[in-house]
Amino acid sequence: MAGHSKWAQIKRQKQAADFRKGQIFSKLAREIHVAVREGGPNPETNVRLRMAIERARREGMPKDTIENAIAKASGAAGGAAEYETIVYEGYGPGGVAIMAIALTDNRNRTASVVRHIFSKYGGSLGETGSVAWQFETVGQIVVATDGHDPEEIALAAIDAGARDFEVEDDSVIITTDPDQLSDVAEKLEAAGYQIRQADIQRIPTTTVELEGGQAQSALKLLEALEDLDDVQEVYTNASFPAEVRSAV
């Protein structure tokens, strides 16, 4: 796959460049809301909420905004919408698999918009389970090298219970079992490493290399899904050539 980049790499580059910060905050507030509704407002006993708060802090979300999101979801403040999680699965140009995870207060609205985006860029929305089997759910931690030897970070992660690692630019991407994510992240942070991101991800078991027009169309489809306020995460098994990556 020399010269090609995975969608996850492209997303991390965009986030590092501080793109769409307001939209990121909006999505994080929704995640906090759902976490509170499912497990209560105490991050000590609610792992999903604790992870959402940690991610919000790493993204620079103000403390007051985090606290307001928790208060709204717990009923201490009025005006809270009710969200449900919906997973959309489909195919993009070149037959690549795509998953979009949405938190929505209107499933009909979201389904209509998602279907339109798939169609607009040469894809098709599929049935539940149509592509999920092509992905594995893992914990993923992005650690800044920040002057440290990447191998040193990787060894510390393995000692803390991580499964695997990959060095990427100025980061080390750590993979864990989902239930080990929080524990490994806490140990790395306690050891003095800078955690840029720690969350549950769906990674493709194999990738499909795209070229030319198919790569351009697939990237536009993925970015259009990412731009939807209702969509929290987008995953694909596509990989993209360097010229498409540099155009992002």
From Swiss-Prot:
GO terms for biological process: regulation of DNA-templated transcription. Gene3D superfamilies: 1.10.10.200, 3.30.70.980. GO terms for molecular function: DNA binding. It is found in: Cytoplasm. It comes from the Bacteria. Disulfide bonds: none annotated. Transmembrane segments: none annotated. Pfam families: TACO1_YebC_N, Transcrip_reg. Keywords: Cytoplasm, DNA-binding, Transcription, Transcription regulation. One of its GO terms (cellular component) is cytosol. InterPro entries: Integrase-like_N, TACO1_YebC-like_2nd/3rd_dom, TACO1_YebC_N, Transcrip_reg_TACO1-like, Transcrip_reg_TACO1-like_dom3, YebC-like. Signal peptide: none annotated. SUPFAM superfamilies: YebC-like (SSF75625). Belongs to the TACO1 family. NCBIfam families: PRK00110.1 (NF001030), PRK12378.1 (NF009044), YebC/PmpR family DNA-binding transcriptional regulator (TIGR01033). This is Probable transcriptional regulatory protein trd_1132. It comes from Thermomicrobium roseum (strain ATCC 27502 / DSM 5159 / P-2).
